[in-house]
């Protein structure tokens, strides 16, 4: 038996041409996702056809109270898995009324790099592995963990099945299907090493699209956990001690790296990353020093290293890439709370320009 509220939520709106567009943007902390909805007269498939909008930037730490208006520019459209039909999710970035980007608009900065002719010619692909931890809402302690206590040591939980090893799978599967419905290039999902921690992947996507897709996938995950009364944490080290942290490993390749002989170019790119190690670390996520300790499948934050199939290195090259002499590499330094606009554009800038 359905409730009156669920009946209203599932109302059939097919008799109206109007749609609901949920405008999504990033708040002042760089990790808080905000959104609000508006009615449009009919279906829209191109973001350039969407109206700009505004919001109170003084309530998101992005503007002063006496000049609080911040303008949203629609940039990417995805199907809305919550309202369904012709309703849409709209990824936006933020600008001052005069037209200049607000300081926290990393998307605008990234587009400049991805629009550079040398970068465009290389068709940079990014695949991002987003790890996260599910927490009980009232106590902010991982799902499946005894209240105030700890589960058994790590080992049985990675890609595991069973009620004593996998906690929150319904959320993971709902998120997976919602992302597919929305048109996101979600490539997979799996349980992680620490119990209560999971991962989903955005498959190789060109340029700025990888950042747009990861932010919308995060938004969908936040909405699903909201419905379930669970908190999703992107903290890179949510539990101190002998537990794995949470990362956003970023896989990268260029057109040249994907061709025969590309392994030599991958090695050259890795050398460039080593030279700018400190600059990348500074932009790879807040609190990352708690994760990058040299333990739990990480490299020490102060030391750059790379290796084939080495998950304790800063950068990993896969066995298949080594064997075929072409392919991609994985930057294992970005934390789970990184800004993908910043990370992807920095990798492209350092290795191509």
UniProtKB/Swiss-Prot annotation:
<dbReference type="GO" id="GO:0009507">
    <property type="term" value="C:chloroplast"/>
</dbReference>
<protein>
    <recommendedName>
        <fullName>Glutamine synthetase cytosolic isozyme 1-5</fullName>
        <ecNumber>6.3.1.2</ecNumber>
    </recommendedName>
</protein>
<dbReference type="InterPro" id="IPR027303">
    <property type="entry name" value="Gln_synth_gly_rich_site"/>
</dbReference>
<feature type="modified residue" description="Phosphoserine">
    <location>
        <position position="3"/>
    </location>
</feature>
<dbReference type="InterPro" id="IPR008146">
    <property type="entry name" value="Gln_synth_cat_dom"/>
</dbReference>
<comment type="similarity">
    <text>Belongs to the glutamine synthetase family.</text>
</comment>
<keyword id="KW-0535">Nitrogen fixation</keyword>
<keyword id="KW-0067">ATP-binding</keyword>
<dbReference type="InterPro" id="IPR027302">
    <property type="entry name" value="Gln_synth_N_conserv_site"/>
</dbReference>
<dbReference type="InterPro" id="IPR008147">
    <property type="entry name" value="Gln_synt_N"/>
</dbReference>
<feature type="domain" description="GS beta-grasp">
    <location>
        <begin position="19"/>
        <end position="99"/>
    </location>
</feature>
<dbReference type="InterPro" id="IPR050292">
    <property type="entry name" value="Glutamine_Synthetase"/>
</dbReference>
<comment type="subunit">
    <text>Homooctamer.</text>
</comment>
<dbReference type="InterPro" id="IPR014746">
    <property type="entry name" value="Gln_synth/guanido_kin_cat_dom"/>
</dbReference>
<feature type="modified residue" description="N-acetylthreonine">
    <location>
        <position position="2"/>
    </location>
</feature>
<keyword id="KW-0436">Ligase</keyword>
<dbReference type="GO" id="GO:0004356">
    <property type="term" value="F:glutamine synthetase activity"/>
</dbReference>
<keyword id="KW-0963">Cytoplasm</keyword>
<dbReference type="InterPro" id="IPR036651">
    <property type="entry name" value="Gln_synt_N_sf"/>
</dbReference>
<keyword id="KW-0597">Phosphoprotein</keyword>
<feature type="domain" description="GS catalytic">
    <location>
        <begin position="106"/>
        <end position="353"/>
    </location>
</feature>
<dbReference type="GO" id="GO:0005524">
    <property type="term" value="F:ATP binding"/>
</dbReference>
<dbReference type="GO" id="GO:0006542">
    <property type="term" value="P:glutamine biosynthetic process"/>
</dbReference>
<dbReference type="Pfam" id="PF00120">
    <property type="entry name" value="Gln-synt_C"/>
</dbReference>
<keyword id="KW-0007">Acetylation</keyword>
<keyword id="KW-0547">Nucleotide-binding</keyword>
<dbReference type="GO" id="GO:0009506">
    <property type="term" value="C:plasmodesma"/>
</dbReference>
């Amino acid at each position: 038996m359905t409730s009156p509220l669920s009946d209203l939520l599932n109302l059939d709106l097919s008799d109206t041409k109007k749609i609901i567009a949920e405008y999504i943007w990033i708040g002042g902390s760089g990790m808080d996702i905000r959104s609000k909805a508006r009615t449009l007269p009919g279906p829209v498939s191109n973001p350039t056809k969407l109206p700009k909008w505004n919001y109170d930037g003084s309530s998101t730490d992005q503007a002063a109270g006496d000049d609080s208006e911040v303008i949203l520019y629609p940039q990417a459209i995805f199907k809305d898995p919550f309202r369904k039909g012709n309703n849409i999710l709209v990824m936006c970035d933020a600008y001052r009324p005069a037209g200049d980007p607000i300081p926290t608009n990393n998307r605008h900065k990234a587009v400049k790099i991805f629009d550079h002719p040398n970068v465009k010619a290389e068709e940079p692909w990014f695949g991002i592995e987003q790890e996260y931890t599910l927490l009980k809402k009232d106590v902010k302690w991982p799902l499946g963990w005894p209240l105030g206590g700890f589960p058994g040591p790590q080992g049985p939980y990675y890609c595991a099945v069973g009620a004593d090893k996998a906690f929150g799978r319904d959320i993971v599967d709902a998120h997976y299907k919602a992302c597919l419905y929305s048109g996101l290039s979600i490539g997979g999902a799996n349980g992680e090493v620490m119990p209560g921690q999971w991962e989903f992947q955005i498959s190789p996507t060109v340029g700025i699209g990888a950042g747009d897709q990861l932010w919308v996938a995060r938004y969908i995950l936040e909405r699903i956990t909201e419905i379930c009364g669970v908190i999703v944490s992107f903290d890179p080290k949510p539990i101190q001690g002998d537990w794995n942290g949470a990362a956003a490993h970023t896989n990268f390749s260029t057109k040249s790296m994907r061709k025969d002989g590309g392994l030599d170019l991958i090695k050259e790119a890795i050398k460039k990353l080593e030279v700018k190690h400190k600059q990348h670390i500074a932009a790879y996520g807040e609190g990352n020093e708690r994760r990058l300790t040299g333990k739990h499948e990480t490299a020490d934050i102060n030391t750059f290293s790379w290796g084939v199939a080495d998950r304790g290195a800063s950068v990993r090259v896969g066995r298949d890439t080594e064997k075929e002499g072409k392919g991609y590499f994985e930057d294992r330094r970005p934390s789970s709370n990184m800004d993908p606009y910043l990370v992807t554009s920095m990798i492209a800038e350092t290795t191509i320009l």
